[in-house]
């Protein structure tokens, strides 16, 4: 199940890459696609470790750089905005599913802890990328409105 969900996530990122994106963001996403294949390899081949702290640091640095260009959030936002941002949100939700799958798998099988952390950081990066893409494409974040009944 985990391999299928990783493949689904990778495919959604592939769809996202068909959208007009800044070149530096395309490079990040293409690197992520390769890393997702590596995580699949780790799950398929015993003692095959490809994801490490350097790859996690790469994601965190890119996440922080994009986040520094955005206003801080004080409310929840709804997925949407530009098409590219919507694909980021879709990828983020599948990434969260991958994280749950890997966490559950780790209860019975050996799973690289760095891969779990990478997937967690990837979902955060996809959220920030969605907001960043909305900003550069002149779409506002849509804030969740608490029911005031």
Please give the residue ranges for each predicted region.
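Phosphate/pyrophosphate-binding loop motifs in nucleotide- or prenyl diphosphate-using proteins
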Residues: 1-149
């Amino acid at each position: 199940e985990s391999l299928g969900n990783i493949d689904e996530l990778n495919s959604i990122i592939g769809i996202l890459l068909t959208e007009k994106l800044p070149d530096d963001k395309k490079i990040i996403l293409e690197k992520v696609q390769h890393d997702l294949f590596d995580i699949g390899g780790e799950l398929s081949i015993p003692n095959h470790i490809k994801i490490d702290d350097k790859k996690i640091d790469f994601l965190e640095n890119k996440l922080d750089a994009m986040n520094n260009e955005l206003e801080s959030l004080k409310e929840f936002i709804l997925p949407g905005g530009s098409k590219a941002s919507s694909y980021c949100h879709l990828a983020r939700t599948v990434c969260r599913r991958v994280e749950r799958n890997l966490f559950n798998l780790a209860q019975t099988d050996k799973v690289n802890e760095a891969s779990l952390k990478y997937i967690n950081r990837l979902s955060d990066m996809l959220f920030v990328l969605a907001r960043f893409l909305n900003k550069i494409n002149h779409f506002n974040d849509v804030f969740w409105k608490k029911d005031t009944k």
